[in-house]
């Protein structure tokens, strides 16, 4: 748990990566089996994952926000001394902000932490961790359940949902057309809430199309993951990577069903 301005806090979950050495990484297959129409965005593609920090057993991990960033958290960081009230409305995921706003949030939050709670940040080899948007690979690895699920479950389009998808993800089928307060449904196997549904989540890196078993060389717009409350159940999954332009005709792109969560990592070469 990290403190926030206005006496708030942000909760993180440990995401182990099955690595034990600082430069070790593991191969993970992300995406899924897809038809030709959307294979450019969803087809299974090899990726690599590693962890920034090590526990007492030398198991390496990174940290992922347990919940989507809320309106109250976003405003507490971005508006400085003007502390927002915390109620049902401000406990909804923060929306209608651009990718650039999300990155600015992480920058301002890091500056606040370094000034007010530097001792609370995790460290690796003397270097303090920092908050940023998760990469596409980090997001999908964590949303699928990481090392908490077996290989067969990891490769499914959704993490294990023994009680049915409506108990784990907000979609057009159960959200009644409304954004929902964070954390009301069941979490995924790593204790992360709402990775699927509610709001789609922006990640740090840009969109690349799949080209057979690799990514295309051109990087395009931003990536939105997980589907949202206005999407059907079939669109709320771990495989879909939706490309969203960074800008529209009015400026930086903002959407009513798009938000973000954050991760904590550390410099690679400390």
Predicted regions and their residues:
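Short, polar loop/linker segments at the starts of domains and inter-domain junctions
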Residues: 8, 23-53, 179-185, 236-247
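Active-site microenvironments of metalloenzymes and redox enzymes
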Residues: 28-158, 264-270
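Functional-site microenvironments in short loops/helix caps that host divalent-cation chemistry
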Residues: 103-238
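Short, solvent-exposed loop/turn elements at domain surfaces
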Residues: 21-28, 71-73, 211, 232-236, ...
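Extended N-terminal export/anchoring regions of large proteins
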Residues: 1-9, 14-23, 29, 55
